[in-house]
Design a protein with these regions (language model features):
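An N-terminal domain-cap segment
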Residues: 1-63
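C-terminal edge-of-domain segments
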Residues: 107-260
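Catalytic micro-motifs at enzyme active sites that drive phosphoryl/nucleotidyl and oxygen chemistry
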Residues: 14, 36-39, 58-59, 77-83, ...
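A structural signal for short, well-ordered beta-strand segments and their strand-loop junctions
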Residues: 26-28, 73, 135-139
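General beta-strand recognition
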Residues: 48-51, 71, 137, 213
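A general structural signal for short secondary-structure junctions and capping/turn motifs
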Residues: 16-19, 62-64, 82-83, 88, ...
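Short, structured beta-strand-loop surface elements
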Residues: 55-118, 133, 142, 222-224
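Short, surface-exposed beta-edge/turn micro-motifs
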Residues: 22-25, 45-47, 67-69, 132-135, ...
Length: 260
């Protein structure tokens, strides 16, 4: 009888989280060198608003009447310095077009409301001698996420229905803090690993509402293990309680020590 996998975010949820927290994004068009895109924002209709140098090849190609086929690659890096730092990659394929000039100001406002990215100031202007950027639309045709376990495609309707993980923004700082200042927490969590995986360098790898992931770095390679919470959590209070349960701290689970 197959062993059930522990609860985990869906592929659509993972893509939505990477869209928010990705530490690298590249825009590629056949026949041109891929370029960094400092803005990559998923809009309500499923298109991505992206930016590229106003005088660059991407903007020129997107200026054609029919646009051009393009791929947006988002990289999800682990927040710690690991031997294999890339946790997942997301590829968004679609048709790239320039945003008509009259629509740019309103679209910038929409993006800035959710993500006040300083690079938005470079669209149609050049503050502090930075590169002038153009705002482009990538009309999504397909979305794929890949990690060490394989690749999975996601329908656009499922992508729009999903939401980013509630902890994707604080995940990096939280894991860095635990790894640097609270190794005792990591040691307690590591005690829940299979005995065969307890030898090696154990580091926090990921955090989401379903649980924690640990990376075990050994001479024979890396092993990732999910430690699921008893139930999904949606706020910091619930997160703290769930982690204490994983650590095996009885009094912090809601019990109280006897007095007297």
């Amino acid at each position: 009888m197959p062993v059930a996998s522990p609860p985990a975010p869906s592929a659509a949820e993972r893509i939505r989280s990477v869209c928010v927290s990705a530490t690298g994004a590249m825009l590629a068009v056949d026949g041109h060198t891929a370029v960094d895109t400092p803005v990559h924002h998923l809009l309500d209709d499923g298109a991505f608003a992206v930016t590229a140098a106003a005088d660059g090849d991407m903007t020129a190609a997107a200026g054609n009447a029919t646009g051009v086929e393009a791929v947006l690659e988002l990289t999800d890096h682990a927040p710690l310095a690991l031997r294999s730092p890339v946790r997942s990659l997301v590829w968004i394929r679609g048709r790239l077009r320039r945003v008509p000039a009259p629509l740019v100001p309103a679209l910038l406002d929409v993006i800035a409301t959710d993500d006040p990215n300083p690079s938005l100031l470079q669209v149609n202007s050049v503050p502090c001698n930075d590169t002038q950027l153009s705002l482009l639309w990538l009309q999504t045709e397909s979305a794929v996420i890949a990690d060490a376990t394989g690749a999975e495609s996601v329908e656009l309707r499922d992508l729009l229905a999903a939401r980013p993980d509630p902890f994707c923004v604080l995940e990096s700082s939280w894991l860095q803090h635990i790894d640097a200042d609270h190794r005792e927490v990591v040691d307690l969590l590591a005690a829940r690993l299979p005995v065969s995986l307890r030898r090696g360098r154990i580091r926090p790898l990921g955090l989401d509402r379903y649980g924690l992931r640990l990376r075990v770095e050994r001479a024979d390679g890396e092993h990732d293990v999910r430690l699921p919470f008893a139930a999904p959590v949606n706020d910091v209070t619930g997160l703290g309680r769930a982690i204490r349960v994983l650590m095996g701290c009885p009094f912090l689970n809601g019990l109280r020590a006897r007095r007297g």
